[in-house]
A protein has these predicted regions:
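N-terminal Rossmann-like NAD(P)+-binding domain of SDR-like oxidoreductases, especially those catalyzing
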Residues: 1-146, 190, 200, 267, ...
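C-terminal substrate-binding subdomain of Rossmann-fold SDR/epimerase-dehydratase oxidoreductases
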Residues: 13-16, 69, 153-297
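A short beta-to-alpha transition loop/helix N-cap that caps and shapes the active-site region
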Residues: 96-98, 149-151, 217-219
Length: 297
């Protein structure tokens, strides 16, 4: 981010601190007198699903109540300012949980099965309530999994990418993972950030799904990522004893129960046709292989 750092004005913030958030938003308003539109993107969250089972109260406070704090600050701004504010809330496909229909779109019923998803669902509905009840310009982006080279090291896709890099460099022999049979709809964060921005450029606010419309198992992601670096992975054994073995009969993937979630989301597959039609949203990274290639960069 060095190329844009001189243009940024960074502040410490905490979604559990209403006073601090209010001071920051009012400071932005004072420093930008005469602005036409003020766009606020709420991307802050405790976003690790498995960890949300370990710290459910914190997850609810930050991901759920934290969003309400922002909305309430916006609601109490002077009307002349409030009407210029546009608010984006980062929703998640995890809200669909044990899916009730496939593919999932804006009308699919939610069925969350993690503290993270439940907190995000509260934020989703509060965003709608403040839009419909107070006339605020608020929108929910229901984003399916989106990755990039900046993905956190404790997330599945980056664990695989970094693990392969470590295998190549000789720092480790295999990668240890959890459930490899769950299915996900993976896209690139660059495309999805473009979609977020497009949502706040519309005359009227609404909610939109961003997804690729393709789903792959974690197993397939592993195979394709290894293949990109010249490894051909096949599988031996079952359950916790299953291993991924390369073309030289060296074990490269093992399974550990500690990485399983208490409740597993088995299948996520999004339908972004509304965003494509109404926002003109298009994806640059249109295949899983292009995504993997960029994650190795």
């Amino acid at each position: 981010l060095d190329h844009i750092r001189p243009k940024l004005k960074l502040r410490y913030g905490d979604l559990s601190d209403s006073a601090g958030l209010s001071n920051y938003i009012h400071e932005i308003v004072r420093e930008n007198q005469g602005f036409t539109i003020l766009e606020i993107y709420n991307l802050a969250a405790q976003s690790h699903v498995k960890i949300s089972f370990e710290i459910p109260e914190y997850t609810a406070d930050i991901d759920g109540i934290g969003t309400m704090r922002l909305l309430e600050i916006i609601r109490t701004l002077d009307p002349g300012i409030r009407n210029k504010v546009r608010f984006y809330q980062a929703g998640t496909s995890e809200m669909y949980g044990k899916v009730l229909e496939t593919p999932q779109n804006e009308t699919t019923p939610f069925n969350p099965i993690s503290p993270y998803a439940a907190a995000k669902l509260y934020a989703y509905y509060m965003t709608k309530i403040y839009r419909e009840g107070y006339g605020l310009y608020t929108t929910n982006g229901i984003l399916f999994n989106h990755e990039s080279p900046r993905r956190g090291a404790n997330f599945l896709t980056m664990k695989v990418i970094n693990g392969i890099k470590s295998i190549i460099s000789g720092k480790k022999v295999w990668i240890e993972l959890g459930n490899i049979d769950s299915k996900r709809d993976w896209g690139h964060a660059k495309d999805y950030v473009e979609g977020m921005w497009l949502m706040l450029q519309q005359d009227k606010p609404d909610d939109y799904v961003l997804a690729t419309g393709k789903t792959y198992t974690v197993r397939e992601f592993i195979e394709r990522a290894f293949a990109f670096k010249g490894y051909k992975i096949h599988w031996e054994g079952e359950g916790l004893k299953e291993v991924g073995v390369d073309q030289n009969d060296i074990i490269r993937v093992t399974i550990n129960a500690k990485y399983y979630r208490p409740c597993e989301v088995d299948l996520l597959l999004g339908d972004a046709s509304k965003a494509e039609k109404e926002l003109g949203w298009k994806r640059e990274f249109d295949t899983l292989d292009k995504l993997i290639e960029d994650m190795f960069s």
